[in-house]
Amino acid sequence: MEKFEGYSEKHKSRQQYFVYPLLFQEYIYAFAHDYGLNDSEPVEIVSYNNKKFSSLLVKRLIIRMYQQNFGINSVNHPNQDRLLDYKIGFYSEFYSQILSEGFAIVVEIPFSLRELPCPKQKEIPKFQNLRSIHSIFPFLEDKFLHLDYLSHIEIPYPIHLEILVQLLQYRIQDVPSLHLLRFFLNYYSNWNSFITSMKSFFLFKKENKRLFRFLYNSYVSEYEFFLLFLRKQSSCLPLASSGTFLERIHFSRKMEHFGIMYPGFFRKTLWFFMDPLMHYARYQGKAIFASKGTLFFNKKWKWYLIHLWQYFFSFWTQPRRIHLNQLANSCFDFMGYLSSVPKSPLLVRNQMLENSFLIDTRMQKLDTIVPVTALIGYLSKAQFCTGSGHPISKPIWTDLSDWDILDRFGRICRNLFHYHSGSSKKQTLYRLKYILRLSCARTLARKHKSTVRTFMQRLGSAFLEEFFTEEELVFSLMFTKTTLFSFRGSHSERIWYFDIIRINDLVKPLN
């Protein structure tokens, strides 16, 4: 406990950041507006009669949120209240969105100040490739072959947004900002029901995505801080990523309360993390925890994590949200891939002088497969094919120019191949490529009121070049006299690209 208190004091900041006055600075909302325009996932900014932004209107909005009858009016007469606000000019979707983005920017300031890199860590930028999503798969290929069990975890969600606000109190001691956050969240009466679904938690409303992402990340860093402390105290292996987790103020008090409720429980569970062969990875609202040991060992850890969420964070969770399976006999969904570690037979011939021996061995290998059925279902929902995978035209794009249509289909195909380049079976990707290519041809043929065969003959090789992937382009430069399609089986090896920093849009609905 003394070590923990020292660790907590080391990472705890005693400075109090008063961020509330920044909400009335106009440049903050200019940053929020620029973020919406320059973000990699664009946010649609709702226009407001082409009027210029004014911090005075934001101030009026904040004052109105503090009125006592604000919550009652918005619940009893939501449509009438919204229409009245729109007419008088100081409440609209535009200013609600700007206030949400502005508050998210302001409240992130204390955390960015705590995470400023020290001069000794100037070497870190050379490891920028580790930011890539694909960088984790070579790690899994190296480590998972020696593990026994895998737990697939669905991270529990708070039953009420007030819990997220209370978690922020340990880091932000600016009371007016927290009160404003409560009033702002209470306005959206549908947010409480909106947050009760883990799937919907990540399909944020576009105009409030940054604020929700901040609230969720602050919650996740809380329980990961607990796991980080146990890991650092029980293993001699240093963690290079320890700086990414944020501290929790007054954590030792909660630890003492936890020890009173479960005397001796904390001391007994320390050995859970003594084994260095334990690996944790989180993505979106899920996490995987792989370890080496017995079934009893992993079941105890499962119940330990459930008690941690229920009694430590007041988050209700159920045992079925943690699926424990033997790694060699299970398949898990991770980052858009269906991964498994099967044992493949390998026949090795060993010859010694005049005698020859055949040795039958079984080797383990991380197998990553593209969930083709789910991707075809998504393409069907996007009207590129039928539910059975039969390509169809996309009428909504027939108003575009021919090259715009080719560019859109080609970009989707290249992005799909780029993200799923690590697949063990590339045949499924070529099936998706066939669907997109024929759907593009039918869309162009429908636009020009001709047949697919006639249109393909008119475009010739220019049509096929739009669907070339990076691997095929490399092979076309190496072997210019050979057609690209003859190399389909020769470049079946998995390729991980280190320039992918976010999940493909086609993968998001699958998680």
From Swiss-Prot:
- UniProt subcellular location: Plastid, Chloroplast
Q: Which GO terms describe its cellular component?
A: chloroplast
What keywords does the record list, in alphabetical order? Chloroplast, mRNA processing, Plastid, RNA-binding, tRNA processing
List, alphabetically, the InterPro entries matched.
Domain_X (IPR024937), Maturase_MatK (IPR002866), Maturase_MatK_N (IPR024942)
State if tRNA processing is listed as a keyword: yes
Tell me the Pfam families matching this sequence. Answer: Intron_maturas2 (PF01348), MatK_N (PF01824)
Could you name the domain of life of the organism this protein comes from?
Answer: Eukaryota
Q: Name one GO biological process term.
A: tRNA processing
Q: Which GO terms describe its molecular function?
A: RNA binding
Similarity annotation:
Belongs to the intron maturase 2 family. MatK subfamily.
Function (record text): Usually encoded in the trnK tRNA gene intron. Probably assists in splicing its own and other chloroplast group II introns.
Q: What is this protein called?
A: Maturase K
Q: Which organism is it from?
A: Phleum pratense
Which gene specifies this protein's sequence? Answer: matK
